Regions:
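N-terminal export signals
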Residues: 5-26
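C-terminal segment of N-terminal export signals and the immediately downstream linker at the start
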Residues: 19-49
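Conserved beta-strand hairpin/beta-sheet module of binuclear metal-dependent hydrolase folds
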Residues: 37-128
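Hydrophobic/aromatic beta-strand patches that form the interior of the parallel beta-sheet core
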Residues: 49-51, 139, 166, 208
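Short, solvent-exposed loop/turn and secondary-structure capping segments
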Residues: 61, 114-115, 150-152, 177-178
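Active-site metal-binding motif and surrounding structural segment of the metallo-beta-lactamase
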Residues: 92, 116-166
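Catalytic metal-binding/acid-base residues of hydrolase active sites
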Residues: 107-109, 144, 171
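Metallo-beta-lactamase
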Residues: 126-130, 134, 161-164, 169-212
């Protein structure tokens, strides 16, 4: 915050305190509708757009496994964050290049509930004036659900029908091997099933793996 802004705020404070309670109560409540979740900026000669897919919540207990719960809660409290729940935002990035649009990760994908807290990437693409049919490359960083979930539509079709899908070879080899699934912890097995769903024959035909 700039010094000038702080000074103006300090000078205005006495005047704000003189506002009658009736006037304060008459103010309209803040709207509940979410503003379009995208932000556009430049990377050298390219235009990039971050696309908000929503956010999820997770309990703090058990989420961080390499530190005691008390230490995690202390750090959260020092950062003025809740100590019982973590809010995790999901954002994908799209870059406009002379060859077309390149999308990095695809969000959680379509959700059944209309008020679901995630799965908003397509709506925010539309709000930003970006057409999924113009995406020529989709780069997947890894195979967690919030990265590959948006590869297909609610009907099971390819969400980006003209795109080549680029994935790390190591990720592809691990999550498509049934032997790995059988010896993985229970908590990881959903990712194997989700990988099979997202990389159905239609999207698998668009696949290009890269060496790690």
């Amino acid at each position: 915050m700039k010094r000038r802004t702080v000074l103006i705020g300090a000078l205005a404070a006495p005047a704000l305190l003189q506002v009658r309670p009736v006037a304060a109560q008459a103010q309209a409540p803040a709207p509940l509708a979410q503003a379009p979740g995208f932000h556009r900026f430049r990377i050298g000669g390219f235009t990039a757009t971050t696309l908000h897919d929503g956010s999820g919540t997770r309990p703090v207990q058990g989420f961080v496994r390499n530190a005691p719960l008390e230490d995690v809660q202390r750090v959260l409290a020092e950062s003025f964050l809740p100590t019982d729940t973590l809010r995790i935002p999901f954002t994908a990035t799209l870059v406009e290049t002379p060859r077309g649009l390149t999308l990095f990760d695809t969000g959680n994908g379509p959700q059944q509930a209309a008020n679901a807290p995630v799965g908003r990437l397509m709506a925010n693409m539309a709000a930003a004036g970006l057409d999924p049919a113009r995406v020529t490359t989709v780069v997947i960083s890894h195979f967690h659900g919030d990265h590959i979930g948006g590869l297909i539509t609610a009907e099971g079709a390819a969400a980006f029908p003209h795109a080549e899908i680029v994935v790390p070879a190591a990720e592809w080899a691990w999550w498509t091997d049934p032997a790995n699934e059988s010896r993985s912890p229970e908590g990881q097995r959903a990712t194997f099933a989700n990988t099979a769903r997202r990389f159905a024959p239609e999207t698998r035909a668009m696949l290009l793996t890269l060496a790690s």
